Amino acid sequence: MTTAAIIGGGVIGGGWAARFLLNGWDVRVFDPDPEAERKIGEVLANARRSLPGLSDMPLPPEGKLSFHADLGEAVTGAAWIQESVPERLDLKLKVYRSIQEACDPGAILGSSTSGFKPSELQEGALRPGQIVVTHPFNPVYLLPLIELVTTPENSPEMIERAKEIMRGLGQFPLHVRKEIDAHIADRFLEAVWREALWLVKDGIATTEEIDEAIRMGFGIRWAQMGLFETYRVAGGEAGMKHFMAQFGPCLSWPWTKLMDVPEFTDELVDLIAGQSDAQSGHHTIRELERIRDNNLVGMMRALKAQNWGAGAVLNKHDAALKPKALPDLDTADLTQPILTLSRAVPLDWTDYNGHMTESKYLEAFANSTDRFMEIIGCDADYIAAGGSYFTAETHIRHLDEAHAGARIRVETQMLLGQGKKLHLFHRMYEGDKLLATGESFLLHVSLETRKPCAPSPEIEAAMARIAEAQAGLSYPEGAGSAIRKPA
């Protein structure tokens, strides 16, 4: 088990702790705040509810979390040390000195700083090349972007190792090759923030109206396509040059007060805080965090279905987890029902009753059928060559409830696999509890004629192998059932 040390257990430090812990790392936390354990516990509760459901594969077993009163004890032997202390350069440099006196020279020391350059953090350090900026975005346990900012002091080998570790956590390391104050993303956030302050101060818009302008329009566009690609599309068939020619004159118009900052007075603070309370004060912070996480999970899973943006990052992480998560024809115990799905129930799989909605049982069983098809050789290459299976009939029994975050698995028994016919019986479990069964009858088809036909000899052989191995299994209870006519 690999160990990470988290120095500073606030919102960001807690998010880092959750990201490492839920990806199988042991985590040691150092934070003198007597409330640190409670605060991190609340962040972890949110993370356990939301992060596992982003993946279509099971995450590794959760690591061990421990809290330490001694900084040296926390960092000794850690492979990754993440500093998330307050944004004071003198404090950070003091903390680095203490860390480097105790830590492994080969450990990566990442800073969550949103503003300082890595060269500033490396100044006077015992080992400057050990320190990099790894700037995350809240919630750290969900959002994949990490701005990895380096200097010539950092070796190429160390930089690649840092990237590899972050990718293993399901993150997207964006290597910022030239350091600058506030890196990349926070410079955009600061520009938008300054413009928003002016709009409120001048009475043009309220905090709620500004938020609506973002979340009802360009915020959604940016989330899926960014800034430049969005404008490229806006240019139509003529592309980016047309867009630039069309809107270039705007640069000389009074459309922004970007470099002109309103005076930061108590009156401005009270004005914005009051409007914000009126806008969102009916929700607690914890409620808002859960609303945020629900929305982020839904949006990122939608991007995942398109293999786009943050969704493509999630799919790559799933692909890395898959070989260890599900067996194939040669590694499965074919004498028993075969594991064809193992995952957590995502937030967007639940309904108004607070449990997994019926359409998602069908989706889960369909995914299990797809996995069984892969096991017998009907994979993407086979389908591209013109053969596949079509489902002719499905029957689902709902036997118990599943809730968001529940770790479920599906085990599949082949009742018939002969010629063009494939008859499967799926059982869905949470632990030892049987939640549902799904029965499917499929026909092998030619994608050219769209009519049933015999599968390849390789698929026939794989089905025969499974049929022989599972011959001793009893016929499942519930198989062949239908909804009975009411008495």
Swiss-Prot record:
NAD(+) binds at residues 8-13. GO terms for molecular function: carnitine 3-dehydrogenase activity; hydrolase activity; NAD+ binding. GO terms for cellular component: cytoplasm. Pathway: Amine and polyamine metabolism; carnitine metabolism. It catalyses: carnitine + NAD(+) = 3-dehydrocarnitine + NADH + H(+); N,N,N-trimethylglycyl-CoA + H2O = glycine betaine + CoA + H(+). Residues 1-327 are annotated as: L-carnitine dehydrogenase. In the N-terminal section; belongs to the 3-hydroxyacyl-CoA dehydrogenase family. L-carnitine dehydrogenase subfamily. This is L-carnitine dehydrogenase/betainyl-CoA thioesterase. It comes from Ruegeria pomeroyi (strain ATCC 700808 / DSM 15171 / DSS-3). The lineage of its organism: Bacteria, Pseudomonadati, Pseudomonadota, Alphaproteobacteria, Rhodobacterales.
